[in-house]
């Protein structure tokens, strides 16, 4: 039986295992034939959407890995706008509105509100937080 999943990632790209574990879990459930509709990045998890992140050559590039997963499997990557702006992650529109010199949101990620999280959670069979 195939299930629809939604993930919420609250851990940063680096510093603890939550984001890495979420990515590994996402890959595993897709390999098993399940569907992953949305990954919502909240709290420190918004750092997973910072395109300026530059890990060492021997580390997994989680930002690009999430992007690749989303492209390959049509997964929506939503980033809590309030949490992102608070932590210095912004898209071009918000940077312009806030009179900042540039944006750093990785392509493939989208700033959104908690309403997107609620919609995703209501539309899936399993909701898992990392």
From Swiss-Prot:
NCBIfam families: PRK00207.1, sulf_tusD_dsrE. It holds the Pfam family DsrE. It comes from Sodalis glossinidius (strain morsitans). Its main location: cytoplasm. The lineage of its organism: Bacteria, Pseudomonadati, Pseudomonadota, Gammaproteobacteria, Enterobacterales. Part of a sulfur-relay system required for 2-thiolation of 5-methylaminomethyl-2-thiouridine (mnm(5)s(2)U) at tRNA wobble positions. Accepts sulfur from TusA and transfers it in turn to TusE. PANTHER family: PROTEIN YCHN, SULFURTRANSFERASE TUSD. This is Sulfurtransferase TusD. GO terms for cellular component: sulfurtransferase complex. Keywords: Cytoplasm, Transferase, tRNA processing.
């Amino acid at each position: 039986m195939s299930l629809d999943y939604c993930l919420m990632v609250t851990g940063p790209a680096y510093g603890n295992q939550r984001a890495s574990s979420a990515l590994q879990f996402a890959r595993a459930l897709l390999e098993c034939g399940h569907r992953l509709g949305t990954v919502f990045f909240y709290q420190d998890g918004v750092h997973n959407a910072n395109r300026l992140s530059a890990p060492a050559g021997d580390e997994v590039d989680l930002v690009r890995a999430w992007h690749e997963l989303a492209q390959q499997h049509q997964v929506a990557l939503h980033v809590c706008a309030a949490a992102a702006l608070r932590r210095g992650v912004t898209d071009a529109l918000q940077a312009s509105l806030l009179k900042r010199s540039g944006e750093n949101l990785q392509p493939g990620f989208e700033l959104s509100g908690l309403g997107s999280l609620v919609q995703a959670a209501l539309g899936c069979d399993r909701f898992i937080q990392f």
